[in-house]
Amino acid sequence: MGKNFLNDFGLPAGAKFVCFTIRDSAYLDRHKANENFPSRSWKYHNYRDGDIDKYVLAAEELARRGYYILRMGVKVLKPLKSSNPKIIDYVNSAIRSSFMDIYLGAKCNFCISTATGFDDIPGIFRKPIAYSSLTPFGLTINHDEKSLILAKHHINKKFKRRLTVSEIFLSNVALCIKS
C-alpha cells in the first residue's frame, strides 16, 4: 500500500525522499470549538510556529539534489507554494492518512522539522532529523548522533542582539514554554 502511494505521487521505486514538517497554529486551532476545549486558547504556543514559505528554498535545493519532498501534517494554515513536481504538499492531498504518515516517517531518508509530534515517527525508525528554529532549546530531544539541531534565534531587545547559547541557558530562556 505504501509503495503504491509513492508511485501515485510520481516517486519511482527507490527514490530518495524527505519528510518536511513545519509547525503552524492550524493543528491546535482546530480544537478551539469542541466540547473538550470550549474556551481554550493555544496562542501561548505561537512562538513555536514556522512559516512554510521560508522553507521553500530549502525544499527546492533538496529537489535539485535529487530528493522528493513530502510536506507532512494533519492540518496547516496555507499550502506549500512550489511548481516543482518533486515537492509534494502531502498534508493537503486527498490521500493523506495516518497509515501513510507512519509509512513515510519510517521510509524517509531524513526529516526536516520545527519540532512536532510527527518527529517521533522518524525518530523511532532511527532516521536523521534536522530540527530548524527549535524552541524551547532546553527541552531538546536528540534521537541520535545523526540529528542536527538549529535553535530559533533569541534576541535581547534591550541590546538589540542575538543571545549566545550560554546566555540562552544562563537567563533561563532555554526553558520558556510561552511567548
Predicted segments, located by residue:
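Surface-exposed alpha-helical segments enriched in charged/polar residues
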Residues: 7, 56-60, 103-106
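Short, glycine/acidic-rich beta->alpha junctions
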Residues: 47-54, 93-97, 103, 111-117
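Catalytic donor nucleotide-activated moiety binding site of glycosyltransferases and closely related
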Residues: 15-29, 50-97
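Leloir-type glycosyltransferase catalytic cores
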Residues: 1-8, 145-179
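Secretory-pathway luminal glycosyltransferase catalytic domains
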Residues: 1-43, 178-179
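Charge-rich alpha-helical segments
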Residues: 2-6, 43-53, 67, 129-131, ...
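A donor-sugar binding/catalytic signature common to diverse glycosyltransferases
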Residues: 101-147
